[in-house]
Design a protein with these regions (language model features):
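Peripheral peptide segments
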Residues: 1-188
Length: 188
């Protein structure tokens, strides 16, 4: 994986996942607070990274974290965007659904555009979404931590990405620890 281009600057991390059929709020809310279920593991990883310190001195953050969610209704959005719940049956769960949302909302184009400034991009998405990301070449070489199917291990390695086999609902505790250590290493 590539080193940070600006070693003394804060480490910029982007975490990407997709929505869930579990809506935690009935009204308007941030996307971060709206989705539960399988998103919970990823939200815990985001919180862990966001609250970590570089050293014993807790005033020096380990990294600056941004969180993006690929939603069935709104496309790809930052997790702090305000959203309303939609029927759980409208949540993407098949290759056809993902392709339809891509046609309507171009989430791959938004991911490609917004991911360029980050030192590390952590991707925890379903297998078909990962295939779409790879096919579109939507993420930069040398900066991605891909939590995905073993089917993509070779392709991830060709792009100088860190491949982690998906464990658990989206991330898994062991993978979360590996990701945390990778971010700690690049932030030193």
């Amino acid at each position: 994986m590539m080193a940070k281009p600006y070693p003394n600057a804060p480490t910029l991390v982007l975490v990407i996942t997709n929505d869930s059929t579990v809506f935690l709020k009935k009204g308007v809310s941030s996307a971060f607070d709206m989705f539960g279920g399988r998103c919970t593991e990823v939200k815990k990883l985001v919180a862990r990274l966001d609250t970590a310190s570089k050293t014993e001195d807790t005033t020096k953050k380990l990294c600056e974290v941004s969180f993006g969610i690929i939603t069935s209704k709104y496309g790809y959005i930052p997790a702090d965007y305000t959203v309303m719940p939609y029927p759980p049956e409208e949540v993407m769960d098949s290759p056809e659904d993902y392709e339809a949302v891509q046609r309507k909302k171009d989430f791959l184009g938004k991911i490609d555009y917004t991911s360029k400034l980050f030192d590390r991009i952590i991707v925890c998405v379903p297998k078909h979404v990962m295939k779409m990301i790879l096919d579109a070449n939507a993420l930069p070489n040398g900066r991605v931590i891909a939590v995905t199917s073993p089917d993509f291990k070779e392709e991830c390695e060709k792009r100088d990405w860190l491949f982690l086999e998906r464990r658990g609902a989206r991330v898994g505790d062991a993978n979360a620890d590996i990701i945390f250590e990778e971010i700690r290493k690049i932030s030193e």
